Every structure is written in C-alpha cells, then in structure tokens.
Amino acid sequence: MVNGLSEVGIKPDYNLLVIEHTKYVDTLLKLGLKVDVLDPDDTFPDSVFVEDPALTFANGTILLEPGAPSRKGERGLIQPHLTQTFDTVFKLVEGSAEGGDVLRLNKEVLIGLSDRTNELGARALKKLLLELGQESRIVETPRGVLHFKSDCSALDEDTILATPQLANSGIFENYNVILTPENEYSAANSLRVNEKLLVPNGYPRTAELLSRKFDVEIVGITEVAKLDAGLSCMSLRW
C-alpha cells in the first residue's frame, strides 16, 4: 500500500495509513452504510483505491480499465465481489478509464479526460453508462491534475465544490459552485455521505465555508494524500 503511485514523492507511514483507513471505514459505518472491506493484495499497492477500477450504481456496475500500467489487473481483484453483488455487470473493453475521473451528479455523469482516462475509454464508457440509464458528458480535466475529481466533488444535487481553475472552465455552468479557498485546492475532493459532508483534514477555511450550509465532519487523510488520493478514492458507493 505504501508503495503506490505518488507524484508527491513522500512515502506514507504504513501504520498511520492503516489507522486512517480504519477510521475512514468506521466513519462510513457510523453514518449508516454497510461496508465490505476487501482483502489486501500487495501485487497491486494502489488497489486500496477501489474507486478507480469500477463504477457502481443501484442497477448495475461497470468494470473499468485503469490507465496507469501498474494498476492493470486491479479490476480482476474486485470483479468477483461485484459480480456477486450485482446482476448487471458491464466491462470496459476499449481504451482506459478510471473512476477518479467520473463525477456522478443527479442529472448526468461527467467523464473527465486525463492521463488516466483517454478519449477512447471515455466514449466506450459513455455507451455503457447509457445501458444503465445514465446520461453522460465528456469534459477536460485541467492540466497537471491527476483525476477530474481531484478538483471537484458533488455536495448535493445542484451544488459542486471545485477549484477555481476547474470552475472557470465553464463545465459547471448549470450548477451552483462553491470555490475552494486559495492554497486549499485539495479539499475539493470531499465526500457527501447521507446528510454528512466529509472534508479532509488540513483545510480549515474550506471546512468553515462548507459548514455554513452543510453538516461537516473532518476526516484525517494525511498519509492517504501522500499517495495522490482523497476521500472518494477508498470506496465504491451506491
């Protein structure tokens, strides 16, 4: 797990990382979710970030194809569990796409093109989403951003938390947008769970801003962030 991909270049502390993951799971349980924790696999150190190799909806799942070479094969780890859970299972067979580039909204699904999700994969994913009754739109992820959702998250049906650079692209012109404060752009990957809004630690101005409208809970992911990951990365939710 600590040997996962990282652009930050700082190796996380294994024991602290395990503690953060355990507290993350405990938080989801406390908020009323049923949580299945899969066994670790050292062959794929990034496999703890289960959001990337699959998408899950109430009526089915889509197995994706990660764009990072070291993550090829991760969907094979998660496939047995998802096929036991869902009657409808689709598999992306063209291009690459990672769940971190997919933002699910009430009216549509946004697919962000990035170094991990290419045009071929996005177009193939768009067709599979339609099979599940989901309209989608392909958009551009800002340069230098790992995943589309590194810079945004859905706070409710009509409200997006986004970095200024992503908000200024016009992608969210039909939504209400809350901008992350300067120097707190990584807080853009927050996570709405039922009535609670989970916000990563270390971003006090963002937490204060969001607490004016939402019930905020701070979740520690200091070590997780060293692996270029955020709150949404460690779970598949439906």
Placement of each model-derived feature along the sequence:
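The feature marks the mature, well-folded catalytic cores of soluble enzymes
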Residues: 1-238
